[in-house]
Amino acid sequence: MAQRPVYPFCAIVGQEEMKLALILATISPDLSGVLIRGEKGTAKSTAVRGLAALLPQHREIPGPYHLSPDEYPTHAVALNLPEVMPEPRTVQVPVVELPVGVTEDRVTGTLDMETALREGRRRFEPGLLAAAHRAILYVDEVNLLDDHVVDLLLDSAAMGVNTVEREGVS
């Protein structure tokens, strides 16, 4: 898939408060995110993509969770990952876009109940929150999202973790 060109973050004229907020959010993950409000054409998504292109590459373990090599040992068992850590790769920080009509299952991921019933084992299909781990989650038109999806995003950001449970299985 061809990557579209990214407008340079430093070439955005004006919007100093927005640019500062984005920079601060990348420096301090404790901020948990930035809400940018503005009219169409005010460089909101351009700034986010431009900032992502500026961020340094990082090492991650290939797979749906984008774990760092340091995170892998503590998360491998809970996420049902191979005991032996795969070879890390170096990647650019991605921008994961949350579509307006997104469902809760698509955001959080889902437990495959068919596999649980048929094979007696848990199988989790990670969602967009897993894809956004160590990445930028971009939500355009947040006001058009279903309220329960917004609540889910806010809870996950505040808690720093997302737990999926279905019919007593988590």
Regions found by a protein language model. Give the residues of each.
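Conserved ASCE/P-loop NTPase catalytic core
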Residues: 2-170
